[in-house]
């Protein structure tokens, strides 16, 4: 298991600026935000320049994060389950562009939101809408050799392991998989360590942050909340995962280097104990 850090904590920096900073902390990987001010629009990113910087600073790309769309509206919108088809199309095309960027960058994964916020529609009708979009997207993902990772989150159409497992049964492709956010499952009042085993057939990448005992969805520096990371890491090791666990601390925009360093120190110590 390797540690990466998400560039979404560095929104006051350019992507070119945060690459060396993340490397200097000690991380071996970076998750690239596919939104302003980093890889947006995805088609406009200077791939040659970014690949050169990554090589210079010995960083791998853990994942392309296409979850938020502040460039167009906000964290969740346009979502996969909008009533207006043209808005769903914006999300679809953005994710396709991120898949293409992943191929050009040599990254294997693009993560996306778990459907979107619930609307005044029946739950099943929103599920059917999301399923249709994912099955259509999967054909492009397969052509490009990139896996799209759904990320369940509190308050979205998919927020728990039960939601994900029920939904994935209707997906026709192995190129739609899971971005396992440890904090999100904890917020859903599930044991993340148990969920690693339960969802192991679908996991391709992990997000990591801590959460307070209240289980309110507010990302904290690992070690400052109540998640038992030792048990989660043991489960990940038992599962045989060799990829990156990406620390995601976007609330720390004012001091991402401090937050990243504190997280790295804490997590590195835990890994030495496993």
What are the residue ranges of the model-derived segments?
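Glycine-rich, proline-tolerant flexible connector loops at the mouths of alpha/beta enzymes
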Residues: 32-55, 114-118
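Short, small-residue-enriched loops and turns at beta-alpha junctions
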Residues: 38-40, 68-69, 117-119, 154-158, ...
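Conserved radical SAM core fold
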Residues: 34-38, 70, 117-119, 210-217
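Active-site acidic/histidine proton-transfer and metal-coordination neighborhood
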Residues: 16-17, 56, 73-177, 189
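Glycine-rich, aromatic-flanked loop segments that form ligand/cofactor-binding clefts
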Residues: 54-68
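Histidine-acidic metal/acid-base catalytic patches
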Residues: 1-7, 11-26, 48-55, 106, ...
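Conserved beta-strand positions in the central sheet of alpha/beta enzyme cores
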Residues: 31, 63-65, 111, 204-207, ...
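Residue-level detector of anion-binding/catalytic polar loops
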Residues: 28-29, 60, 108, 147, ...
